[in-house]
């Protein structure tokens, strides 16, 4: 689903020469990872801002800018205000959101839905994980389109990403062993780990 989603929004994104990622809270940290992976795979400079700061520093945004707004709810007011500022300056806006039809999604040129479902816990683990997946897929696709990554690299990375669910299942099967190990390590005052 992510691969189809990124292709649907991809062609217009690849002609930009500057990228801004703007978000708040946990989504901001997904944006920081996005910066690293986009710069590495696409070779385009990326800036990441906390949404509340973006509007007040008069950022260099124009029609050659891709503005990525990341928001779990799609209703984060600071992110929405930053998105409006970027659009006013001519940027192409891509939102990475979880909630279909949210304000951020409606006001964006393109939307990449995370499909994380509702977040029950305070820790935004599902949303963060799916936002990271979106950032990786976006970077891979843009890198492929710009010729910065090869088709073999792209296909291999996609294969690895698709393996994540089975790797997680293997990990969770080891939960009893991990719990036992944690009980052993819990009272130690010092642990030395070497290769």
Go through the PLM ranges and name each one.
Residues 7-12, 173-184:
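A short, well-structured juxtamembrane/interface segment
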Residues 185-190:
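Long hydrophobic segments that form regular secondary structure
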């Amino acid at each position: 689903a992510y691969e189809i989603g990124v292709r649907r929004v991809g062609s217009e994104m690849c002609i930009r020469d500057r990228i801004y990622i703007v978000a708040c809270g946990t989504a901001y940290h997904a944006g920081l990872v996005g910066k690293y992976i986009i710069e590495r795979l696409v070779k385009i400079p990326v800036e990441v801002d906390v949404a509340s700061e973006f509007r007040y520093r008069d950022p260099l945004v124009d029609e050659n800018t891709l503005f990525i707004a990341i928001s779990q709810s799609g209703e984060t007011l600071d992110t929405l205000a930053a998105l409006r500022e970027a659009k006013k300056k001519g940027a192409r806006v891509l939102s990475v959101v979880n909630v279909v039809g949210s304000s951020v999604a409606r006001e964006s040129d393109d939307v990449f839905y995370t499909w994380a479902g509702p977040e029950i816990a305070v820790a935004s683990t599902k949303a963060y994980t799916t936002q990271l997946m979106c950032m990786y897929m976006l970077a891979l696709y843009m890198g492929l389109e710009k010729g910065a990554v090869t088709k073999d690299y792209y296909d291999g990375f996609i294969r690895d990403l698709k393996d994540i669910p089975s790797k997680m299942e293997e990990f969770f099967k080891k939960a009893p062993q991990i719990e036992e190990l944690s009980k052993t390590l819990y009272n130690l005052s010092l642990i030395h780990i070497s290769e």
